[in-house]
Structures are given as structure tokens and as C-alpha cells.
Amino acid sequence: YKQIVVLDAGHGGSDSGAVANGYKEKNMTLKIVQAAKSYFDDDPDIKVYYTRLSDTYPSLTERSDLANEVDADRFYSVHINSAGSSATGTETLYNSKGYKSSTGLTSYSWSATIHPYIRSATGFTNRGLVNRTGLAVLRHTKTSSTLTEIGFISNKSEAKKMNSNLTNYGKAVYNSTKASFSKNPTGR
């Protein structure tokens, strides 16, 4: 394969992640990743490894280790945000001190490519790119890594809209990944 990605559905199993308005983050992230898988499965150019495809909880270390073991070109973690009930919007997290891909792609550049696709799919407020150097998966994954926060589960209307559009977000995950590989080929 010329392109290798690790796709991570945040939380899972005993770790529900954010819970609000009758929804659980772990279920939403899993459905998004499962939807993305249906697109990746039809693409012979990209090999995708998944940290989970069911309601299990891989540790944060296991998630990073998977990417490191398979020599991934990209690590893509999908999450749902939570804050006060009025918080709104889509943001994508990168690590300015994180590793680059083998071709020199930074966490910032990878995040900057995918963010508009996710934001466009949600239609939510654009919270932009946020530098987070302390997150385990963005710190220990030895390639270009990103973590996208689709929207706020703590916001009632946003949670409801997310729940009915998870498949669309999965498609955006796929399309944004394709765009990144077009823009920054792997050299494999």
C-alpha cells in the first residue's frame, strides 16, 4: 500500500467519553469510523488500521502503538466535544511539538487539510485549529497525527444534529484523508 492510516474512534468500552443529552461520545465516534470504513473499504490505495470497530476500549498507549507498529503515514482520531450547554462548533487539535510523517508532514498541516472537510460536513461554528501538546495520542504517535472534535454533545441541538449525521461525518473523514494524500503524497 502507498498510503497507511490509523483511524481511531475515541473512547469505547468502559470509557463512554462525554455523555450528555441522552448520547454517549463512544457510540457517536464508533458510528463515524464505521461509516468511514465503508468508503475506505472501496479504496484500493489506502490501507486503514482501526483502533476499534466495536464497543471496546484500547488504551491510549495501544492506539499510538498501533500507528507506530504499522508505520502509519497518518493518525486520525475522532472525538466529540463537551463543555457548557451553549458551547458550539467544530475544532481540530494538533500538536506543534509532535512527530512528522516520514515525508515531513506536520501535525498542523495534516490538521489544516482535514479541518475544512469536517467543518463543512457539520455546518457548525468554525473553532479552527487548536494546539494541544499534552494529549497522549498526539504526543506518542510517531507520525503526523490529528484529533478532530466534531461538535458539542453538551449542546442539545448540536448533539441531536450530530446523531443524525454520523454517516456524513464518516464520508468527510474519508474525503479529507484522500485530500491529504493528494496534497502530500507518501513517497512509498
Task: For the regions a language model picked out, list residue spans one by one.
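Catalytic-core regions of hydrolytic enzymes
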Residues: Y1-W110
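Sec-exported extracytoplasmic/periplasmic mature domains
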Residues: Q34-D45, N68-A72, I80, H115-F124, ...
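Active-site-adjacent mobile loop/cap segments within catalytic or ligand-binding domains
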Residues: S77-G84, L93, N126-R188
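Active-site-adjacent substrate-binding region
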Residues: L105-V130
